């Protein structure tokens, strides 16, 4: 099975320049010219991305084609790639509880020989709350394949394969910045491949939507978190303001609470991310926030080009 699957995979490595960190994950090759399916959280926050093909061991610079944050799907392109083997795709609709599966990936982000975690399907249509430290706040992921298999950080974005070696899911594993609530050490989740490919095809066709973002990411330059449920206004709490960014120039400070963008309410950190996803670098938006002493503030902000997602 491994010999059938491995040539259609890549190891993804990211530099998170604003966080002073690095990350790693896995990708599934969709096209000989280097279109690759992975998780959004694998590339989120990246200022530089490279990928190593398991078919030829070549390291490629990576461009982001687009992403769907709500469904945790992204499509990237390996710059200069051609003639790559592609993954063999199956259908997640044929899966049943008890079916044998295996998760293949870049376990713990170490590169080298790929990891192989056998197991079986334990639930279809599962949901899990994922805490995203890079993007702030938490998100609910729905309609997932739950598996009993030892999936680890670095496996994210890699294939869940059936006994025929066909890709039936995209693994969603905990990473240093992405944590699954209530998940034991020997289980994991995957996005059904039928849904993942539908989103990937939309991204590759250049069709944006309320959930799909194409091209460069707009950026205001803040680290955010959900506001506490009690004791203050709902919104996105500013944890950090990066220097020389639109937010800093507008006067935002750590401890402020962003409450709206262009009059659209921001009730949680994810709301702010979703609104900015639909804007482009160079667009002007009107930010509304409550400052640390409780004063309402409003200012126009020109969005900059920022890290992915």
Task: Label the model's feature ranges.
Residues 59, 284, 296-298:
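A structural signal for beta-strand boundary/capping segments at domain termini and interdomain linkers
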Residues 6-8, 79-88, 117-186, 218, ...:
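Active-site region of chymotrypsin-like
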């Amino acid at each position: 099975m491994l010999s059938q699957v491995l040539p259609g995979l890549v190891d993804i490595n990211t530099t998170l320049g604003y966080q002073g960190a690095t990350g790693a994950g896995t990708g599934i090759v969709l096209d000989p010219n280097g279109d690759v399916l992975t998780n959004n959280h694998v590339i989120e926050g990246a200022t530089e991305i490279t990928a190593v093909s398991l078919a030829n061991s070549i390291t490629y610079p990576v461009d982001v084609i687009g992403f769907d944050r709500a469904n945790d799907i992204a499509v990237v392109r390996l710059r200069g790639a051609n003639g790559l083997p592609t993954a063999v795709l199956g259908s997640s609709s044929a899966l049943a509880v008890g079916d044998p599966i295996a998760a293949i990936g870049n376990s713990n982000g170490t590169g080298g020989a790929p990891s192989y975690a056998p197991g079986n399907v334990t639930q279809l249509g599962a949901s899990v709350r994922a805490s995203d430290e890079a993007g702030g706040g938490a998100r609910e992921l729905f309609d997932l394949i739950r598996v009993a298999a030892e999936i680890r950080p670095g496996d994210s974005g890699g294939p869940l394969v059936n006994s025929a070696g066909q890709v039936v899911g995209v693994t969603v594993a905990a990473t240093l910045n992405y944590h699954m609530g209530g998940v034991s050490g020997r289980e994991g989740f995957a996005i059904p491949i039928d849904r993942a490919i539908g989103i990937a095809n939309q991204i590759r066709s250049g069709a944006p939507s309320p959930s799909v973002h194409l091209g460069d990411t707009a950026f205001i330059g803040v680290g955010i978190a959900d506001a506490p449920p009690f004791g203050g206004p709902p919104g996105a709490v500013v944890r950090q303001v990066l220097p020389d960014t639109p937010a800093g120039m507008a006067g935002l400070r750590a401890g402020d609470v962003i409450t709206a963008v262009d009059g659209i309410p921001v009730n949680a950190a994810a709301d702010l991310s979703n609104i900015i996803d639909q804007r482009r670098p160079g667009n002007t938006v009107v930010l509304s926030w409550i400052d640390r002493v409780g004063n309402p503030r409003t200012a126009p902000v020109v969005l900059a080009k920022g890290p992915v997602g």
